[in-house]
Amino acid sequence: MRAKACGWGLLLALAGCGGFVNGDLRTGTVKGRILGVEADVARVSVMGHSELRTTVAADGSFQLDGVPATSLELFVVASRTRAARKSVVAQGAQVTDVGDIASSPGAFLTVRVSDESGAIPSGVEVELKDTGLDRIKLEPGVGEARLGPLPTGCYELEVKADDLEDVEEELCVREGEEQVRAITLPTDDDGGGDDDGGDDHGGRDGG
């Protein structure tokens, strides 16, 4: 009985001091293989966690570490024209193998940006939030960006430019669709300043 009592005391002490490595239980690893990849452009990211993304090996295999142990969705770019979204339940402190992921023809979104006078603003940035895709920064005088391939689904588009209000819009795309979205950025009535000083564009989220 004395040995058992000591054992339970040790377990309780470890639990109190983090001996169970709680961080590992909250995250895990997700791996799988994308079919028909073009490895030079293929990538996988966790939607809503854009910092969690990885490239893909020549055989289509990938591995993502530090994935939250919960239900989530993978955003997959398989090639220059194909993409997919894959639901997965990641397990804490384990490797979750999602198996093979087949892609479909992706949608392409063309975003045309102007100010209220119809002119092309400077410092235009276009982003599909929470997808892991890189934010596109347009060259001066360029008011159009093309995003894709995008798997079927809905996304939040964010557009910014110097000294204008930010605009956010929700949009949905279908398999293989070519969609054009015209965005007009309104004048920033605050004169380019923002409350916390952290946004060079001075726009307010949500436009």
Question: What is each residue range found by the language model?
Answer:
Residues A78-V98, D162-D188:
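Structured interaction patches on ligand/partner-binding surfaces of diverse proteins
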Residues M1-G16:
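Sec-dependent bacterial lipoprotein signal peptides
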Residues C17-T29, E38, Q94-A107:
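Beta-strand-rich domain onsets/edges
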Residues G28-S50, A69, D115-D134:
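Short, ordered, surface-exposed loop/turn motifs in non-cytosolic proteins
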